[in-house]
Amino acid sequence: MNAQLIDGKAVAARVRAEVKAEVDRLKLEHGLTPGLAVVRVGEDPASKVYVNGKKKAAEEVGFRSWELHPDEGITQAALLEVIHQLNADPAVHGILVQLPLPRHIDPDVIISAVKPEKDVDGFHPLNAGNLLLGRSTTRACTPYGVMRLLEEIGCDPAGKRAVVVGRSNIVGKPMALMLLQKNATVTICHSKSDLRREVEGADILVVAVGAAELVKGAWIKPGAVVIDVGMNRKPDGKLVGDVEFAAAAERASFITPVPGGVGPMTIAMLMRNTLDAAVRYGLVPVVR
């Protein structure tokens, strides 16, 4: 393997340490403790694991945290009432609705009901629109984390060709916008794209589609930076990303492992977003 591994766990630990230091200062100087409320509907096993990870991180950095766990049969109207109560609670600075939601509940309606200033996922239409317009806003956690990883390895996107594989509202679209804001020339790939051709020209490649080893190592441009957001379980139980890791690592300059690459950064940047929401909500200037 020629590529250097990008250690997402180590970078995430640094982000959490930065957040904790700021939380300690807020408590000492202003009596302000950031509060994060997580809403998990039903018994989806993966959601339970993700929420537990978020609660653990929140405790580590010194937040107050609450998990609201309504039954899967809750009506959309009743869930909206839960959101409205959290919106009105001054102790809650960040609200996260864990996806997926049951089929009878429209996630767009629920996400849009969260106050934009308490939307720490960065999914509210107002925050998504502000990102599009280049305004200061809460950023979607996963692409925000990817940008921090690029910063950590000294990769300046300016003037580089960045290819984002996947166009979801959660990762692909905001990822492309964040790279564009840093003056990369950005291409978004989807099911109708000539994927190999686009990947072969990428200086920075971000793959987020949820398809095991879709991107072949032989396609990677020598010296490229490869960020693999995917996490897929193969029939033998092995976790792999969306990129053929071993072959890609022979050609890339930097590459994220799966697991241990992007995943830890998503939770770390959620902590960052929650702290920033608390600062804005409490009208206290951030010191960075």
Swiss-Prot record:
GO cellular component assignments: cytosol
Family matches, as PROSITE patterns: THF_DHG_CYH_2
GO biological process, alphabetically ordered: L-histidine biosynthetic process; methionine biosynthetic process; purine nucleotide biosynthetic process; tetrahydrofolate interconversion
Catalytic activity: (6R)-5,10-methylene-5,6,7,8-tetrahydrofolate + NADP(+) = (6R)-5,10-methenyltetrahydrofolate + NADPH; (6R)-5,10-methenyltetrahydrofolate + H2O = (6R)-10-formyltetrahydrofolate + H(+)
Entry coiled-coil feature ranges: none
Pathway info: One-carbon metabolism; tetrahydrofolate interconversion
NADP among keywords: yes
Record-linked Gene3D superfamilies: Leucine Dehydrogenase, chain A, domain 1, NAD(P)-binding Rossmann-like Domain
This enzyme's EC code(s): 1.5.1.5, 3.5.4.9
A GO term for molecular function: methenyltetrahydrofolate cyclohydrolase activity
Keywords assigned by UniProt, alphabetized: Amino-acid biosynthesis, Histidine biosynthesis, Hydrolase, Methionine biosynthesis, Multifunctional enzyme, NADP, One-carbon metabolism, Oxidoreductase, Purine biosynthesis
Ligand binding (NADP(+)): G166, R167, S168, S191
Keyword Amino-acid biosynthesis: yes
Function: Catalyzes the oxidation of 5,10-methylenetetrahydrofolate to 5,10-methenyltetrahydrofolate and then the hydrolysis of 5,10-methenyltetrahydrofolate to 10-formyltetrahydrofolate.
Summary of subunit composition and partner proteins: Homodimer.
NCBIfam families membership: PRK10792.1, PRK14186.1
Membership in a protein family: Belongs to the tetrahydrofolate dehydrogenase/cyclohydrolase family.
HAMAP family attached to this UniProt entry: THF_DHG_CYH
PANTHER family per UniProt: C-1-TETRAHYDROFOLATE SYNTHASE, CYTOPLASMIC, C-1-TETRAHYDROFOLATE SYNTHASE, CYTOPLASMIC-RELATED
Name the record gives this protein: Bifunctional protein FolD 2
Organism: Myxococcus xanthus (strain DK1622)
